[in-house]
Amino acid sequence: MHCPFCSAVDTKVIDSRLVAEGHQVRRRRECLLCHERFTTFEMAELVMPRVIKSNGSREPFNEDKLRAGILRALEKRPVSMEAIEKAVNHIKSRLRATGEREVASQLVGNLVMDELKSLDKVAYIRFASVYRSFEDIREFGEEIAKLEK
C-alpha cells in the first residue's frame, strides 16, 4: 500500500477490524518512512452474474433497474428505504450464491416477488400483475387467493 502523504511503498498495518456487518475490513496503517497514519477500507469485489433476457439477449446485472422495479411496485406504500435496500441486497446475495455466470431474468423476477411478498402484499400483487402479464380480473383473484392461504 502506497503512503498517500509521501508515496512510499512500505506501510505497516497497526489495527484491523471488520465493519459494515463484516463486509468490509477497516485497516489503520502507518508509513514506515514519514510515520503518517491513514485508514483504508477493503471489501471483496463480488461479480454479479449476467442476466439472460426472455428474448435470449444477455446484459450485465443492473442494480438500478432492480431497485427501480421494486420502488415502482412499492410506490405510495408504507415501506422504508432501509427495508427496500435490505431486499435489494438480499436479492443480489442470492444471485451471487447461485455461483452461475449467467442467470435467467425469470430467476431475478421470482426473487423480486419473494422479497415483495414479505415486504408488502399490495406491492407483490402489483409486481406480479405486470411480471406475469395478468389478462383479466380472474388472474388477480387467483393470485390474491394464494396470498390468503
UniProtKB/Swiss-Prot annotation:
Domain ATP-cone residue range list: 49-139
Keywords: ATP-binding, DNA-binding, Metal-binding, Nucleotide-binding, Repressor, Transcription, Transcription regulation, Zinc, Zinc-finger
Cofactor: Zn(2+)
Organism domain of life: Bacteria
Span of zinc fingers (unnamed): 3-34
An example Gene Ontology biological process: negative regulation of DNA-templated transcription
GO molecular function: ATP binding; DNA binding; zinc ion binding
Chain's gene name: nrdR
Function statement: Negatively regulates transcription of bacterial ribonucleotide reductase nrd genes and operons by binding to NrdR-boxes.
Listed name of the protein: Transcriptional repressor NrdR
Organism this protein belongs to: Aeromonas hydrophila subsp. hydrophila (strain ATCC 7966 / DSM 30187 / BCRC 13018 / CCUG 14551 / JCM 1027 / KCTC 2358 / NCIMB 9240 / NCTC 8049)
Annotated family: Belongs to the NrdR family.
Cofactor note: Binds 1 zinc ion.
InterPro entries in alphabetical order: ATP-cone_dom, NrdR-like_N, RNR_NrdR-like
Taxon lineage: Bacteria, Pseudomonadati, Pseudomonadota, Gammaproteobacteria, Aeromonadales
